[in-house]
């Protein structure tokens, strides 16, 4: 029993001495590292060993480069943050965030994945009437010659203007110059006209200095004056303007005049 006690005391003293020797060891002294950079015999401190043999400046340089995000990484991080906020409902977005990255659409366009609506300029009013094989062309030319003889026209009437006004004056309803339907039709003609039409109808000096909008407005007012004269002429001479359709007010005027001539006056 006593022998076991002495043995325990001896072991305790031995462990205490070993611990003291370890504490007194200089950890800054160099030692050999066979597997480190430089091969066998390279002297490294413990801290340098943890850096794989790199100097402190090199380690700092690598650490700085690793902490700097590339541009694409920053973009992905920002998108991830936006989607995270949206999923958590923290506010800041009323709709799903859009991608900040540029997308190359050339491949999608070539495959027909993205279609673009192609618009073409509208055809000019009554352009179809001027085809030489159109059976109505002789009648339009006759009306054109009749309208050109109307006194006090603001400018020389074109065939397009004559055909348009010939149709409007025979409308069943709304053929008066002051109606919205007439104004809208004349405005559309002014908007679809080209520079050649403006040069023909307007003062040459005005055309040189005016903008497109100013020329359209001036031409529109000229068309209004022209139609007012056509309207007055046709109601004074319905036989020269009627399209011979039953719905035409001019045709009804002609039929009414014929009825008055055929029927004898009523006497009491």
UniProtKB/Swiss-Prot annotation:
Keywords: Glycoprotein, Host nucleus, Secreted, Signal, Virulence. Induction: Expression is up-regulated at later stages of infection. GO terms for cellular component: extracellular region; host cell nucleus. Effector that acts as a broad suppressor of cell death to interrupt plant immunity. Inhibits cell death induced by cell death-inducing proteins, including the PAMP elicitor INF1 from P.infestans. A motif (RxLR-dEER) lies at residues 48-63. Glycans are attached at residue 104. It comes from Plasmopara viticola. Belongs to the RxLR effector family. It is found in: Secreted; Host nucleus. The gene is RxLR5. The lineage of its organism: Eukaryota, Sar, Stramenopiles, Oomycota, Peronosporales. This is Secreted RxLR effector protein 5. The RxLR-dEER motif acts to carry the protein into the host cell cytoplasm through binding to cell surface phosphatidylinositol-3-phosphate. The keyword Transmembrane does not apply. Residues 1-21 form the signal peptide.
